[in-house]
Amino acid sequence: MKMFSMLALFVIAADQFTKKLAVFFLRDMQQSITIIPDFFSFTYAENRGVAFGMEFAPPFVLLMLTGAIVLGVLVFVARSRNRTPIFLSAFGLIAGGGIGNMIDRIASGRVTDFIYFDLYKGELFGHWVSLWPIFNVADSAITIGACMLVLFYNRIFPDTEETRHAG
């Protein structure tokens, strides 16, 4: 459990620290910082929705949904007997990222985003599109944790003799 807690706290701290830097250097100084021209930059954005800026519910509902998911992850990890590093890492990343974004929603009603990969900007099926959203450290942690759950599913949730005969 210590690994889970430490990783979640690290993600929260890194997320909040980098968002403070983004507010100061990108929003307050009104600039975008190009790292790799036409590919990677730090660009300030505020997101009232969820992934990819989708706004499917009022801010209060999104806050409650985020809280319920984080609480669900915390309860699941606490009740599970699985203490493997990969299990704790995946769920620690997801919980830390969820809490990091939840802090923003509580403080300002929106999430600060600033990491931007310009993979494609142009016309697609007659509409102007930008194919990659601006995101943050918390979003990255959630995505990495979710990918770990998919990629290492059999190691995280081993198929034991008991579970095979339980159904």
UniProtKB/Swiss-Prot annotation:
Active site: D113, D139
EC number of this enzyme: 3.4.23.36
Chief subcellular location: membrane
Transmembrane segments: 56-76, 84-104, 132-152
GO biological process terms held by the UniProt record: proteolysis
GO MF, one example: aspartic-type endopeptidase activity
Pathway: Protein modification; lipoprotein biosynthesis (signal peptide cleavage)
Topological type in the membrane: Multi-pass membrane protein
Subcellular location: Cell inner membrane
Annotated catalysed reactions: Release of signal peptides from bacterial membrane prolipoproteins. Hydrolyzes -Xaa-Yaa-Zaa-|-(S,diacylglyceryl)Cys-, in which Xaa is hydrophobic (preferably Leu), and Yaa (Ala or Ser) and Zaa (Gly or Ala) have small, neutral side chains
PROSITE patterns, per the entry: SPASE_II
A Pfam family it matches: Peptidase_A8
GO cellular component terms listed in the entry, alphabetical order: plasma membrane
Record key words, sorted: Aspartyl protease, Cell inner membrane, Cell membrane, Hydrolase, Membrane, Protease, Transmembrane, Transmembrane helix
HAMAP family registered for this protein in UniProt: LspA
PANTHER family with a match to the protein in the record: LIPOPROTEIN SIGNAL PEPTIDASE
Family: Belongs to the peptidase A8 family.
Function: This protein specifically catalyzes the removal of signal peptides from prolipoproteins.
NCBIfam families: lspA, PRK14787.1
Protein name: Lipoprotein signal peptidase
Source organism phylogeny: Bacteria, Pseudomonadati, Chlorobiota, Chlorobiia, Chlorobiales
Gene: lspA
